[in-house]
Each structure stands twice: as structure tokens, then as C-alpha cells.
């Protein structure tokens, strides 16, 4: 599953 791959990490510092 790609659900584990997409940990929703924001590209903002």
C-alpha cells in the first residue's frame, strides 16, 4: 500500500 509511503510530510521549514 502507498498509504505507508505517504506520511504527509509538509515541505515547509
UniProtKB/Swiss-Prot annotation:
The keyword Secreted applies. It is found in: Secreted. Disulfide bonds: none annotated. Keywords: Amidation, Amphibian defense peptide, Secreted. GO terms for biological process: defense response. GO terms for cellular component: extracellular region. The modification Proline amide is found at residue 13. Expressed by the skin glands. Its main location: secreted. The keyword Secreted applies. This is Electrin-2.1.
Amino acid at each position: 500500500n502507498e498509504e505507508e509511503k505517504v506520511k504527509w510530510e509538509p515541505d515547509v521549514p
